[in-house]
Amino acid sequence: MQVLNSLRNAKQRHPDCQIVKRKGRLYVICKTNPRFKAVQGRKKRR
């Protein structure tokens, strides 16, 4: 899953991509091609 500042381009990568809001964060989910998953505004783990 990618951590992005903006999901503007992430939602246009595949026609089946959807934006979902969960627990105050925005997620892009794509059931047909899961490599396009993304989240906005979460710190990366090191």
From Swiss-Prot:
Transmembrane segments: none annotated. Keywords: Ribonucleoprotein, Ribosomal protein. The lineage of its organism: Bacteria, Pseudomonadati, Pseudomonadota, Gammaproteobacteria, Enterobacterales. The keyword Ribonucleoprotein applies. InterPro entries: Ribosomal_bL36 (IPR000473), Ribosomal_bL36_sp (IPR035977), Ribosomal_L36_bact (IPR047621). This is Large ribosomal subunit protein bL36B. Signal peptide: none annotated. NCBIfam families: PRK00831.1, rpmJ_bact. Belongs to the bacterial ribosomal protein bL36 family. It comes from the Bacteria. GO terms for biological process: translation. GO terms for molecular function: structural constituent of ribosome. The gene is rpmJ2. It holds the Pfam family Ribosomal_L36. It comes from Salmonella typhimurium (strain LT2 / SGSC1412 / ATCC 700720). One of its GO terms (cellular component) is ribosome.
